[in-house]
Amino acid sequence: MLALGIEGTAHTLGIGIVSEDKVLANVFDTLTTEKGGIHPKEAAEHHARLMKPLLRKALSEAGVSLDDIDVIAFSQGPGLGPALRVVATAARALAVKYRKPIVGVNHCIAHVEITKMFGVKDPVGLYVSGGNTQVLALEGGRYRVFGETLDIGIGNAIDVFARELGLGFPGGPKVEKLAEKGEKYIELPYAVKGMDLSFSGLLTEAIRKYRSGKYRVEDLAYSFQETAFAALVEVTERAVAHTEKDEVVLVGGVAANNRLREMLRIMTEDRGIKFFVPPYDLCRDNGAMIAYTGLRMYKAGISFRLEETIVKQKFRTDEVEIVW
């Protein structure tokens, strides 16, 4: 069976085609701006403009036609309303024109589900991106969020800090490179509340210290990363202890950061459990994870009526009953 998935919750439009155990195509295009950030209207226009070219590219790479596709999947939320609506409209049009079943997929769940293509069974997932920071795991037939940011996503915090430093967007790789040259830890606010996190205080203080001119920028970047990532690892370890699961996966755009990977690897090795990070193109926002999750849902007997495909900007992970 083959599934086609369309992802477009934020600034990346991705289209993926997968079989039950293989990614046949995974193409994307990301809207970038000089100042960073995402304007919902601009994201929607970007997705609408590139939908047809990316669809053609995905079909060409996979060597299939739309007639060969068994199910159409799309990111139903959470995300930016205008961008989500472009994606849903395209998915509906394909489903109707080619008479295919359609499935709406929760974006956050898809980030964790794609790891199961690689043999992961039942993990605790640390999902870190621009807009989302969550620790989630399957419990009682649903993905439960055991901890999350109470204010801004870690990726957003890093990007704002990078913009303050004049590094441009996206800031993650540039902050990471600076941090590698850091020699001294500068104390910054560390906010963990149970299994929830807060990054706004850390960001504000890091910017204040930078503007004071008293600190090396490399040391600030190093300290920012160490503080934020230590908090992420702490709440992940608490979720592991609570759920007694023996696998941890790291997903989302910030999963590209080597220091975060290293800190999680140390924690999981200390606990004697498995740690997995998918290839980066399957960590970032992508259509393949939507296609794969949609295919698993469809095989379990799930398909949507068109009136059920309305987008959900605040689509919680625990709204979805996991029956696959």
Swiss-Prot record:
Coiled coil: none annotated. InterPro entries: ATPase_NBD (IPR043129), Gcp-like_dom (IPR000905), KAE1/TsaD (IPR017861), Kae1_archaea_euk (IPR034680), Peptidase_M22_CS (IPR017860). CDD domains: ASKHA_NBD_Kae1_arch_bac. Pfam families: TsaD. Fe cation binds at residues 107, 111, 127, 285. Binds 1 Fe(2+) ion per subunit. Keywords: Acyltransferase, Cytoplasm, Iron, Metal-binding, Transferase, tRNA processing. It catalyses: L-threonylcarbamoyladenylate + adenosine(37) in tRNA = N(6)-L-threonylcarbamoyladenosine(37) in tRNA + AMP + H(+). Its main location: cytoplasm. Its EC number is 2.3.1.234. It comes from the Archaea. It is found in: Cytoplasm. PROSITE patterns: GLYCOPROTEASE. GO terms for biological process: tRNA threonylcarbamoyladenosine modification. Changing residue 107 to A: Abolishes iron binding. Reduces the tRNA modification activity of the KEOPS complex by 90%. The keyword Mitochondrion does not apply. Changing residue 159 to A: Completely impairs the tRNA modification activity of the KEOPS complex. Does not impair ATPase activity of the complex. One of its GO terms (cellular component) is cytoplasm. Belongs to the KAE1 / TsaD family. PANTHER family: TRNA N6-ADENOSINE THREONYLCARBAMOYLTRANSFERASE. The ATP binding pocket identified in the crystal structure would actually engage the substrate TC-AMP. Required for the formation of a threonylcarbamoyl group on adenosine at position 37 (t(6)A37) in tRNAs that read codons beginning with adenine. Is a component of the KEOPS complex that is probably involved in the transfer of the threonylcarbamoyl moiety of threonylcarbamoyl-AMP (TC-AMP) to the N6 group of A37. Kae1 likely plays a direct catalytic role in this reaction, but requires other protein(s) of the complex to fulfill this activity. In vitro, binds tRNA, ssRNA, both single- and double-stranded DNA, and exhibits a low ATPase activity. This is tRNA N6-adenosine threonylcarbamoyltransferase. The lineage of its organism: Archaea, Methanobacteriati, Methanobacteriota, Thermococci, Thermococcales. The gene is kae1.
